[in-house]
Amino acid sequence: VPANSEGISYGRKEDKMGWNCQPTRTITFENVKVDAGNLIGNEGDGFKLAMKGLDGGRINIATCSLGAAQAALDTAQRYMLERKQFGKAIGDFQGLQFKLADMLTNLVAARQMVRMAAVKLDQKDPEASVYSAMAKRFATDVGFNVCNDALQIHGGYGYIREYPLERYVRDSRVHQILEGTNEIMRLIIARRALLEGATEIIQ
């Protein structure tokens, strides 16, 4: 539908917690006429087509989360090598080493799950939807946690806008909501898991 079609109106730009690089507005359609040449698929199939697009959208959001988490991890690793406390780099302290190890391990695991879901979708696997839901749920939870842990490693500096961590945390938080909340992802996964033989098929 052309954006300037008669009957389309746009609400105010929302003032969001994060993701301020792209505007968010309400779009209202009132008696909008759409040329038959603009029809995608068959009349009445719009909802079904939109639902098919969700799997790819979920993989996309999962990938966004991986990118933010990787940036946060890189920033935290550099900070641990540079920041000195009690006469040595904070990276020498075992507690922070454990935190960094878990961040990296979880991020690698999330990346592999997202890749697997993308392959399933490309191959039109009948279980692609559940793999996409699992990847979206896992990667966005991991992504937010990695960003949050990276902020914690920076201490008070992580909370200051001079450093990028507070933005990574704000931006990654919405990934757990977009393209279906992670609670909805759990419902999709659980409902499939409760069907006969599901735990043998989905591995």
Give residue ranges: language-model regions.
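FAD-binding core of flavoproteins
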Residues: 1-74, 78, 88, 181-203
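Conserved catalytic-core motifs characterized by acidic clusters
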Residues: 13-16, 39-54, 79-93, 117, ...
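Alpha-helix capping/hinge segments and adjacent helical runs
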Residues: 19, 126-203
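Hydrophobic faces of stable alpha-helices that mediate helix-helix packing
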Residues: 66, 70-73, 107-114, 143-147
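C-terminal helix-coil-helix/basic helical segment that borders enzyme active sites and/or dimer interfaces
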Residues: 77-91, 104-138, 151-154
